[in-house]
Swiss-Prot record:
GO BP, sorted A to Z: 3,4-dihydroxybenzoate biosynthetic process; amino acid biosynthetic process; aromatic amino acid family biosynthetic process; chorismate biosynthetic process
Annotated organism of origin: Sulfolobus acidocaldarius (strain ATCC 33909 / DSM 639 / JCM 8929 / NBRC 15157 / NCIMB 11770)
Molecular-function GO term, any one: 3-dehydroquinate dehydratase activity
Annotated metabolic or biological route of this protein: Metabolic intermediate biosynthesis; chorismate biosynthesis; chorismate from D-erythrose 4-phosphate and phosphoenolpyruvate: step 3/7
Protein's recorded name: 3-dehydroquinate dehydratase
Amino acid sequence: MIYISPKLVVALPVKELKDLNRIELLINDVDLVELRLDYLSKFDVDILDLFSKYKEKLIITLRDKDEGGVNYIDPAFKANFVRRMEREKFMYDIEARFALRYQVNVKDKIVSIHYFDNLPEFTEVKEIFDKFDEAYLRKIAVIAKRGYRELLMRVLDNYDNAVVMPMGVNGVERIAFSLLGSKLIYAHAGEETAKGQLHYKDVRRILNQLSTIMSSPST
């Protein structure tokens, strides 16, 4: 196995504006902070001004409810919000289905698909992913049903910019997939935003230990 160092992302559920104060506490501990704005019951586009100074280390996510989001977000508002983020050069994570329907820009952004109930065939994943060659990363999260490991490994074998995540499994599996080529590993800072996330401090410690082992001279 070739050891590949993924970027560590801490997912931060933003339920109140005061939760944004945690950004400054986290950005020096991890590579990126994901702001899950769909946890807010209401906000407007000007919320971007509150954390624009951190944009180089942020991923902004407004997840649709049918793809794992918490609160309903009006699609027209979301499309406008995403275009504002594009203009202001924020990194964002957008669902493939939404990106196609509303023709939002995905160049150098993260495009994602989620399967909570069924495991897709690889051909279905490929058909979707191949529409987003300009994306920075192509991400897939799947329920841990029979065959999910084989599916996710095939995605990694076919896409150099893939992020793969099994849901509802031991968090160590997420680390394993990141070592096999998944570009990001998501963790939490006290509250999971997806089943199977480990605390970011545990992930960081494990990755550091593996890095030390792999960089040590063979005996």
